[in-house]
A protein has these predicted regions:
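Residues at the starts of beta-strands that form the adenosine-phosphate
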Residues: 4, 27-33, 57
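Short, glycine-rich nucleotide/cofactor-binding loops
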Residues: 4-16, 38-42
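Histidine-anchored nucleotide/phosphate-binding helix
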Residues: 14-28, 34
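Anion (oxyanion) recognition and catalysis
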Residues: 26, 52-53, 96
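Short acidic active-site motifs
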Residues: 45-48, 90
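A glycine-rich helix N-cap at a beta->alpha junction
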Residues: 48-75
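C-terminal structural segments of small proteins and small subunits
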Residues: 75-104
Length: 104
């Protein structure tokens, strides 16, 4: 099994850093999982968010998504399926599953 990296993103800033970090980890053969929560769910609507598709398992906090007024716009977020709009339990699973866990 490949080494894995979990990334918790809670800020709607620095998407470029998240993309670069994810690309670097993927290039090194790491399995990457990213959970977006709080204001970070806004990043799902940024054009560069699509650069993460295929490089990581992407999940968004459904509660944060709704709290930010995005309910009904789930299909606009690339690479994130219905089941990937999850609760903080998904974040807890990610932290338990991954060899390394970063908070941004």
């Amino acid at each position: 099994m490949a080494e894995s990296l979990g990334i918790l993103v809670s800020s709607d800033r620095h998407l470029d850093y998240v993309v670069k970090l994810t690309r670097a980890a993927h290039k090194k053969g790491k399995e990457v999982q990213i959970f977006f929560t709080g204001s970070a769910v806004k990043l799902g609507f940024e054009p560069d968010f699509a650069k993460l598709v295929g490089l990581a398992r992407l999940s968004l906090c459904d509660v944060s998504f709704r709290a930010n007024g995005f309910h009904g716009r789930e299909k606009e977020v690339p690479g994130v399926g219905f089941k990937d709009f999850a609760t903080q339990a998904r974040n807890a699973e990610m932290s338990a599953e991954c060899d390394r866990y970063l908070v941004l």
